[in-house]
């Protein structure tokens, strides 16, 4: 019997599971509140934070690369910095995010995440305004791009002592290159009184989402900076000795935390598995005992992302390390389809492909693009990606690493994964050939080398952004029914931060103004419909009617799929005359001739404009719906803000005014987008803060046009990022990348999919996987929201795989512990 059958099918399983767990989730608040009340038994040494000895020198007296904070001669050993921790783990999709929502709603806490995608996802879930976006834990404690190339180091311990005090210093020593740099900058900033109060001074409760993908030393790093910043700014938290409570949320049985190192001399990178924060808290006896994990562990049990009972039972067996009975292995057989079927891009077009390796993802994209190029060339976009190499800096870099024979092209090919988001270049169909050319200045000097590659994307494919990117929302594409629903529900307004409300009202008014003509030009429009439209009340709006300027009647275009004409009628004609002479003439534009821009109107005027247009638009919609028995609402509405817009067959979208005017917003990694096309036109508000060489614009630098899940169309700003390498303590700004910060969601690695909910999933484990791990099987299969939409090329449980779930015995032990809080 299913859960919902007990309630006569009135509620779905997902709703019932969430509601049944709600009371216990609320108990988490009490638990955290209790832990956050702990205080220091004594005080830390006076001014301990101003001059700190490198922890490594306490373990290794011969350590030559010591980095002290402050003045070396005044440096003192770092005192132990106490903390409390709460562990929140559970199966994929079990509702761990609900606990974060509850904490954020009931306690003054600092909510963070380990990755940009997780942080942006939390911002959406918590409905944070632009000024209160959730940050990564790295950004919260002061990490910036200059620290990316600072290598972690090995810590040396001469004896077997494993106290929490020694362990903390050892973990801090591993990350000390970064810690000391951030601390030195903070000391300088507070001396100049140029820095705002850091986030870690706001509360003693620090929530870290997806804590299973960061290395264990980050836990002690967060503790260090909590005490450091609060001591530096003499906050009430420090004066009262409030001990921080770190709430670590995530799943230790999913993707592993990785340690990556790069050798500048050989230009080789090394990647190996490390111990993540969650695994350390659970398995490390010293850390677990200090944090009293036996009493401070909360486990979510049921998968609420996919409420299918049999599938949920299967996932729990993997999560908790239970023996996989033959019937469970047989259960997985139903998802198997031939590899050739899954690898053919023409099959299961709306399904996301998941692979084990980046190479497999890249090969799939190449196969897909080859098919599209043959079947419909206009749907395949090829965009340039530029890399500007600073020649003088590159020569200095070669001297520093002692590799004088190193050339730009081989360096570029070895480092492309470091120049920007790894998956953007490792996964995508980036051209194998690169074009190098020197940028010659007017005086004949050559300061930079330009490298050009090309990236392929498919029109109307699902894409995401790799970081938070500035965008301008300029239009809407969807059904009339959907647009009217958005207007009536005020959903777009509610999702807009308070400081942007006036722009949201103005933008929607611009969309309605642009789409109003379509009611008179619809294939469903009849003389009777026009007569009813004419009778809709259109109140006088003085600031509109005083605008005497007229819009151009028509603009000739080339090779276009669509065309919009807001041509105005002669003032001497009555509405009835208009209807008799021109069936498509629109009385709306005789009343409201031109729409002013936002900055020329007050909030009250824009509110009046929005309300008036909304009433007229919905009235027109109701008339067409009545006459077509609901068919009209299913037809397509494409409208742009205060603009005539056309689309070429090649996918270029252009404005008849040569410029787009929209509402400034941001595209975020947590959202899904559809690639509509690209534009070369000017976009107001975008690109004004970027100083790029003119040669890039001459060669071509389009902006991508995307559509979100609600149907709103935006133009993405180009992404400009700097690559700074650090060698022997010296920083080298070697390269500036100009690209689009986009990545296709048509296919990705299983590791990258962690944390995502995907409607339809096809997993290709390869023909003969050599390094198949149980964690990869678990992550891949648990992404789907409905097992009926899951297919795989093999049953991975019938293959040889590594059971890397070493944490399972600890989880089973916790399940039997009466002090563990279980949330079903």
Swiss-Prot record:
Q: Which UniProt keywords apply?
A: ATP-binding, DNA replication, Helicase, Host nucleus, Hydrolase, Nucleotide-binding
Q: Name one GO cellular component term.
A: host cell nucleus
Q: Does the keyword tRNA-binding apply?
A: no
Entry's Gene Ontology molecular function annotations = ATP binding; helicase activity; hydrolase activity
Q: Does the keyword ATP-binding apply?
A: yes
What GO biological process terms are annotated to this protein in UniProt? DNA replication
The lineage's top-level taxon is Viruses
The protein's Enzyme Commission number: 3.6.4.-
UniProt cross-references to InterPro entries, sorted A to Z: DNA_helicase_dom (IPR003840), HSV_HELI (IPR034711), P-loop_NTPase (IPR027417)
Annotated positions binding ATP: 90-97
Q: Which Pfam families match?
A: Herpes_Helicase (PF02689)
Q: Give the location in the cell.
A: Host nucleus
Q: Which family does it belong to?
A: Belongs to the herpesviridae helicase family.
Q: Report the protein's function.
A: Component of the helicase/primase complex. Unwinds the DNA at the replication forks and generates single-stranded DNA for both leading and lagging strand synthesis. The primase synthesizes short RNA primers on the lagging strand that the polymerase elongates using dNTPs. Possesses helicase-like motifs and therefore may act as the helicase subunit of the complex.
- HAMAP family (alphabetical): HSV_HELI
Q: How does it assemble?
A: Associates with the primase and the primase-associated factor to form the helicase-primase complex.
Q: What is this protein called?
A: DNA replication helicase
Native organism: Human herpesvirus 6B (strain Z29)
Q: Gene name?
A: HELI
């Amino acid at each position: 019997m299913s859960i919902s059958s007990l309630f006569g099918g009135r509620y779905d399983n997902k709703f019932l599971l969430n509601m049944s767990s709600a009371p216990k989730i609320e108990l988490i608040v009490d638990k955290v509140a209790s832990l956050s009340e702990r205080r220091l038994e004594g005080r830390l040494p006076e001014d301990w934070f101003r001059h700190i000895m490198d922890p490594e020198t306490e373990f290794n007296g011969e350590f030559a690369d010591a980095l002290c904070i402050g003045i070396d001669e005044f440096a003192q050993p770092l005192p132990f910095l106490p903390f409390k921790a709460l562990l929140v783990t559970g199966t994929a999709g079990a509702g761990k995010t609900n606990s974060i929502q509850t904490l954020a709603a009931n306690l003054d806490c600092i909510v963070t995440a380990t990755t940009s995608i997780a942080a942006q996802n939390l911002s959406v879930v918590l409905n944070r305004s632009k000024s209160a976006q959730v940050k990564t834990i790295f950004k919260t404690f002061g990490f910036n791009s200059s620290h990316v190339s600072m290598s972690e180091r090995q810590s040396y311990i001469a004896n077997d002592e494993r106290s929490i005090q020694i362990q903390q210093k050892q973990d801090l020593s591993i990350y000390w290159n970064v810690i000391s740099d951030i601390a030195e900058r903070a000391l300088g900033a507070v001396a100049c009184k140029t820095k705002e109060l850091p986030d870690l001074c706001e509360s003693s409760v620090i929530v870290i989402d997806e804590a299973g993908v960061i290395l264990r030393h980050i836990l002690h790093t967060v503790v260090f900076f909590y005490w450091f910043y609060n001591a530096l700014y003499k906050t009430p938290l420090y004066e009262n000795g409030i001990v921080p409570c770190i709430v670590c949320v995530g799943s230790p049985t999913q993707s592993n935390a990785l340690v990556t190192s790069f050798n500048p001399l050989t230009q080789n990178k090394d990647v190996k598995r490390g111990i993540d924060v969650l695994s350390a808290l659970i398995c490390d006896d010293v850390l677990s005992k200090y944090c009293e994990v036996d009493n401070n562990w909360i486990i979510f049990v049921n998968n609420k992302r996919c409420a299918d009972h049999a599938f949920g039972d299967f996932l729990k067996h993997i999560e908790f390390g239970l023996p996989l009975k033959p019937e469970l292995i047989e259960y997985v057989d139903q998802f198997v389809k031939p590899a050739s079927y899954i690898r053919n891009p023409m099959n299961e077009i709306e399904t996301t492909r998941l692979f084990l390796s980046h190479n497999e993802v890249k090969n799939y994209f190449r196969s897909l693009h080859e098919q599209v190029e043959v079947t419909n060339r206009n749907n395949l976009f090829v965009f340039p990606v530029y890399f500007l190499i600073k020649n003088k800096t590159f020569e200095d870099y070669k001297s520093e690493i002692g590799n004088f024979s190193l050339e730009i092209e081989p360096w570029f090919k070895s480092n492309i994964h470091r120049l920007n988001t790894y998956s953007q270049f490792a996964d995508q169909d980036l051209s194998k050939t690169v074009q190098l050319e020197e940028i010659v200045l007017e005086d004949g000097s050559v300061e930079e080398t330009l490298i050009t590659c090309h990236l392929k994307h498919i029109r109307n494919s699902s894409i995401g952004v790799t970081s938070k990117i500035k965008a301008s929302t300029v239009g809407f594409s969807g059904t009339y029914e959907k647009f009217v629903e958005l207007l009536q529900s005020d959903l777009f307004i509610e999702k807009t931060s308070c400081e942007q409300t006036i722009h949201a009202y103005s933008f929607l008014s611009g969309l309605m103004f642009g789409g109003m003509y379509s009611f008179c030009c619809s294939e469903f429009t009849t003389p009777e419909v026009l007569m009813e439209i004419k009778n809709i009340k259109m109140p006088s709006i003085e600031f509109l009617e005083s605008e005497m300027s007229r819009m151009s009647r028509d603009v000739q275009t080339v090779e276009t799929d669509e065309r919009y004409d807001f041509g105005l009628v002669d003032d001497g004609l009555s509405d009835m005359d208009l209807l008799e002479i021109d069936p498509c003439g629109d009385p709306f534009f005789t009343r409201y001739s031109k729409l002013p821009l936002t900055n020329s109107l007050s909030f009250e005027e824009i509110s009046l404009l929005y309300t008036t247009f909304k009433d007229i638009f919905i009235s027109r919609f109701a008339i067409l719906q009545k006459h077509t028995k609901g068919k009209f609402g299913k037809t397509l509405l494409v409208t742009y803000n205060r603009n005539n817009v056309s689309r070429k067959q090649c996918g270029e979208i252009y404005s008849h005014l040569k410029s787009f005017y929209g509402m400034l917003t941001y595209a975020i990694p947590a959202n899904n987008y559809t690639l509509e096309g690209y534009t070369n036109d000017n976009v107001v508000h975008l690109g004004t803060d970027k100083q790029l060489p003119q040669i890039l614009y001459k060669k071509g630098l389009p902006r991508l046009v995307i559509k979100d899940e609600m149907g709103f169309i935006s133009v993405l700003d180009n992404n400009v990022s700097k690559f700074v390498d650090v060698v022997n303590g010296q920083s080298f700004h070697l390269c500036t990348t100009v690209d689009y910060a986009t990545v296709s969601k048509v296919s990705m690695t299983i590791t990258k999919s962690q944390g995502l909910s995907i409607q339809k999933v096809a997993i290709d484990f390869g023909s003969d996987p050599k390094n198949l791990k149980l964690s990869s099987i678990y992550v891949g299969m648990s992404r789907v929201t409905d097992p009926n939409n899951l297919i795989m090329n093999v049953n991975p449980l019938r293959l040889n795989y590594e059971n890397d779930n070493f944490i399972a015995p600890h989880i089973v032990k916790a399940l039997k512990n009466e002090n563990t809080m279980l949330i079903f």
